[in-house]
Amino acid sequence: FANFAKLIRDAQPQPNPTPEPAPDELTALEPRGRDFGAVETQLGAMGWTGNVFPLRGQGDNAKAPAVALEPMLKTPATHVADHCGHDEPMRGFAPAPGFMVLDLDIPKGADEGKPDGYGVLRASGVGIGDPALVVRTGSGGYHLYYRIPDGVDIPQIAHKGASTPLSGLPAYEGGVPIDTRVGGRGFVVMPGSSMPDG
């Protein structure tokens, strides 16, 4: 994790490489058609804690919280705590401190065709370690769930590096397609969520 954080902070301009092919070696849980209760049980069985809450589920802000986010991020949970009713099509998961989700995105807009988040990590030589859970996102990216080792501080990063290339990779106008969703500071769309576009 420290190497990854340093890589993002210390990026230097380099020539543009060929985009990486889609990874074959990642076995990922498909996000659609999952029962929320089963996902919560799986996270709990892995020792994860955090808060599950409803997302708006419609329009341009479909992934935005439908409730106040701060309590979901800051309220300690001793288990996977579900703050939802039974009919929300989209839910968010805010991991507790000590956990994080690495969000490897697919570049969009002006960055389309450039290496995706997984390709950036492969090209950097940092690697992905051994995530507890890998989820394929609705857009084709990945969410990698990790327990943060004691004493390691992971920064919360959301497409940091707009117009700043990483070593050996092209510049990204919309930011490097990697986010960290750190416990107590961020959240992800939970597997089982039904996006408005399917």
How would you label these PLM feature ranges?
Residues 1-198:
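Conserved phosphate/metal-binding and DNA-contacting active-site motifs used
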